[in-house]
């Protein structure tokens, strides 16, 4: 029944929105046929939802049922508009054409409206009973009707009592007279017959009447058996085999199974949620952290090194980072306009001409009165119906349930439903951690900036130059890591740079002193070398001493 109703819902959507707009329903009779069809679908969905014991199917079925009810009310409201605002719509001719009875138009009230609120209604009744008992208030049916009027005088009261008493006595005399008349008639009939029955004769007459009744009943039973044997009369129903009684018992059993399966489903949600968090929570956390860290690096300012602000929780937090929204139409138009700026002047001129022509056309057409927009039926519940149909097709249409005879919950479907919930909870936790991390990074950047500004201020005040001995030690450490033939350009607080090379390689490097393969400087291409012309400069005070025994330095 559920499958049939969902297929009919899909057919209804296609009938309301056909590919050819000319075939769309327009007049009242067409919408009335669609309304009746929705009523039939709603009745099927309501029956299926009431009898279904699978907890997950009941959830999806209820979504489809509520969407169908909403769409039916939308069509009903639209039919009232087409009927010139009259709420009563005559659908007799349409029922005759469709060969349906008037009971089709009765809107059934879904049973879950009362069943889901049973506890609430019971609590309300108990509360009202407690209030009535507390304040000793009697119900309206038990309270006597008191008519307040002018008080009677003593004489009037006596006359009224006497009148009522005379009426009672007259009614009693009439009853006794009727009894006496009946007895007199019986005696007169006996006298006219002239025969007085004895006790034996009276007993024989009674026996004859009883025997006649018994034989007539026996013959009637035999006649009924004959008719049942030839198939002219149905057999009497056994109360134990009554189909209505069996249906009622089956309904009660299904309701009991519904409660049991629903209770098991609620318990499974709690247990499976913990398992999903335990098995897949760490992977979810790492995925979120990786994407947020990549966003930090991508959005960091390359010039200042500042990090962006983390989105507020009210704006969704990292949800926009994990699932960035698609570009809007305005941004696409801006990008297209930016690409069009590189075109020639002709393109600009044409655009200007078109821009000038459009306002003129608008001005010419401005004299016409705006046409009233055509009213359309509401379509609020159509997306809900489409989503319900798609969910049914994707989840239940081709699902093999041969192993689920008792129609209990499906653990895999429960996990699929719980993964987004667990992911959202972990995302909120990671957001809090990443906010703390981002604040620490910002504080670190601010500290580095403040340190740089402090060093610059000290240099401006005239800080003493570092001693040459410290530079010598650092140069020796760096020189040990160099490959043969590499050069080191000393930069820092020394007044002049020095080129260093090992003594045994000085002769090989001395032929092109200060020149590399390109002739621009010592060292391999891509390594640090001396500045052009630095080797030709003469130092004041003569040649410097070598830094060590194994290294020679020259300017």
UniProtKB/Swiss-Prot annotation:
Cellular component GO terms, alphabetical: axoneme; motile cilium
Biased composition (Basic and acidic residues): 235-244, 338-367, 501-521
Alphabetically ordered keywords of this record: Cell projection, Cilium, Cytoplasm, Cytoskeleton, Flagellum
Compartmental location: Cytoplasm, Cytoskeleton, Flagellum axoneme
Principal localisation: cytoplasm
Gene3D superfamilies with a match to the protein in the record: 1.20.5.190
Keyword Cytoplasm: yes
Region feature (Disordered): 232-255, 299-377, 450-469, 501-555
Keyword Cytoplasm: yes
Domain IQ: 154-183, 199-226
Family of this protein: Belongs to the AAA ATPase family. DRC11 subfamily.
Subunit field text: Component of the nexin-dynein regulatory complex (N-DRC). Interacts with DRC5.
Protein's job: Component of the nexin-dynein regulatory complex (N-DRC), a key regulator of ciliary/flagellar motility which maintains the alignment and integrity of the distal axoneme and regulates microtubule sliding in motile axonemes.
Descriptive protein name: Dynein regulatory complex protein 11
